[in-house]
Amino acid sequence: MRNCLSFNPASPEASLGDDPLPHPSLESGVASTSRNDASISSPTFNLSRELAHAFQTPSYHDVRSRVHVVVDLTQIHHRLIQPDIELLLSQVLQPNKECVQEAIRHVKQTTLTNLVSTYFQHSEDATRLCLNLYQNVHSARHHLYTPLLDLFNIFPGDSLPAIDESLCDLAFDVFLKLDTFENPFSSPESYSFRDTQLCFSQLKHNLDRRLRKSRSRVRLIHHATAGSSLCLVAAVVAVAASAVVIASHALPILLVVAGPLCSPYLPHSFKRKELTNICQLNAASKGTFVLNKDLDTIDRLVSRLHTGIEYDKFLIRLGLERGRDVHSIQEILKLLRKSHLPLTHQLKDLEDHICLWFTNVNKARSLLLTEIHLPRPSHVIL
């Protein structure tokens, strides 16, 4: 279990100052959770600044290099080999499935642990989808846009004279190969990202509801404890005043009677348990919020890429339908050249945000797994 909980970021600084995932400070306790929630959902939250910071963190570059190496291992002699997604998942997702299962196995099964288990499962499923998308980015580059770029480098620019027949035949042959390439980004109506987002939204709703319940319990205990202290002081004063009249041996009897009447029995362990639950729930809720926002961004980028690639494939089919006509081929190449740079930028943006997802999901899972096993002080004030 110790190895599972010792997920190491790229550097010691990465574990302290580079975390793009907002989460509660352990020292500030439960009192900070409401303020942190407000800061996360605040309309003044500068997303662009946070993203710029996240893309510069050591942990982000560590995850990116690790994923890049893993994907590159699937390319042999320029032939893209479909890798085992589950194997890639075990190398990218930290803490991995085995560590999570071991941690959950040693925790008493309650509604809370069921919610936490659901959180880990959803984050794993979404990471599996993101791994597929990451491979699709490389597939689009390798099979479609690298051959097109090679073709652009051979052909003259728009301002130069018309191409000859040999170049026209070369372009037509390249179009024939590219026409067989399937769009790796499914249409928005068919891919399952929206189901994952719905699961995350439902999970956050359940976590927040459970979080409010735990906070109410601790507040109740806090106020009841304060009330019982005042009641005990009053009882002691009453005993002292009565001591003039009552024999001293009546003091223990009065305390025994006054204690239960002033305050119900509030076990110390109950408050400690609820405070621990609050920290776990807060970590899971914040992680779910951030990850769902990441999925929103990835979802939009995938939708744009699907549309852009479909447009390029339409142009390629149009060029094939017109045959080996020099003028038609040259016009199609002009249109493809114009859309090439925006599409390559979109591929880069999607790749960046998928790597950011890997960074955030690992931090969220590591934080929550640590919270499950972290002793929590009982003196935190709500």
Swiss-Prot record:
Membrane topology field: Multi-pass membrane protein
Keywords: Membrane, Transmembrane, Transmembrane helix
Region feature (Disordered): 1-41
Location in the cell: Membrane
Polar residues: compositionally biased ranges: 30-41
Main location: membrane
Protein name: UPF0496 protein At3g19330
Organism for this UniProt entry: Arabidopsis thaliana
